[in-house]
Amino acid sequence: EPYRKTGVKLGDEQFALAERWEQAGKLALVGIGVEPGLSDVFARHAADTMFSEINEVGVRDGANLTVAGYDFAPTFSIWTTIEECLNPPVIWEKDRGWFTTPPFSEPETFTFPAGIGPVECVNVEHEEVLLIPRWVEAQRVTFKYGLGSEFIGVLQTLHKLGLDSTDPVRVGGASVSPRDVVAACLPDPATLGDKMSGLTCAGTWVTGTGTDGAPREVYLYHVVDNAWSMAEYGSQAVVWQTAVNPVVALELIDSGAWAGTGVLGPEALPAQPFLDLLTEYGSPWGCEERTPAGK
């Protein structure tokens, strides 16, 4: 029952080694890009400073990036995107634990900040759903990605044709993986920076009861403008947004601001030092207060 029950979940093998890392007095920090990574830090920050009870932690990712000269050019690894989007998405609920749904389930329109606007988002398998419930008290944890109807259609077609498979097939005298062929036919996302325009947004939407006892809904987010990241770092927005977070984490570990033993996710560590240092890098985060449902 792949669309109801989980199998081996993301992180299971890593967390199985946690005791060995603890006994060795060493820290294994997992999931420290932007999503997972910064999104988990946002969840920690919301739980520590903004909410007394959390109903849902929902990571929401969207963008308005375009690539000049291409009808279809993903701005992130198509190999990884196929893996994430066609695997059964995982959801966590306090009363059920972890469970799965069909790909692209529960579509919703989420309005992103900085002028990106409304984007259709769907459930996608992602590490935050496996990490956040381990350290943050919530009723529900989800991850939804703003893929858009065209991208979803392409992924569904690849799946129908078997081109998402990693099992080698014979082509003439060669043995090749269909997914590797798809990746080879598309441009390397890291080389698209000078052809890209627009913004990408990673963030964590949190609902529940605020520290004042009133219903509260917020979206903590990080937006990167491709023009800025190219001008400042010579790197396209999606790549830069992913890469800056492990740099921040390494600095915090080196300074002792982040410390621990065992296998830990970012939400197991204090959020404020991370958010402060990220801002010092000239790429601040933001928080939008939103009107709670039914208010």
How would you label these PLM feature ranges?
Residues E1, I32, D61:
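Glycine-rich, histidine-containing beta strand-loop boundary motifs that form or position
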Residues E1-K26:
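Rossmann-fold NAD(P)-binding glycine/threonine-rich loop
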Residues L10-Q14, P36-S39, T242, P246:
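Conserved donor sugar-nucleotide recognition element shared by glycan-biosynthetic enzymes
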Residues A24-A28, A257-A259:
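Short, surface-exposed connector motifs at secondary-structure boundaries
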Residues A28-G31, G58:
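Short catalytic-loop micro-motif centered on adjacent basic/acidic residues
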Residues G31-P36, V238:
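Active-site nucleophile and cofactor-binding loops and adjacent substrate-binding regions
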Residues L38-M50:
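Active-site-proximal alpha-helical scaffold in enzymes
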Residues T49-K295:
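C-terminal catalytic/substrate-binding lobe primarily of soluble NAD(P)-dependent oxidoreductases
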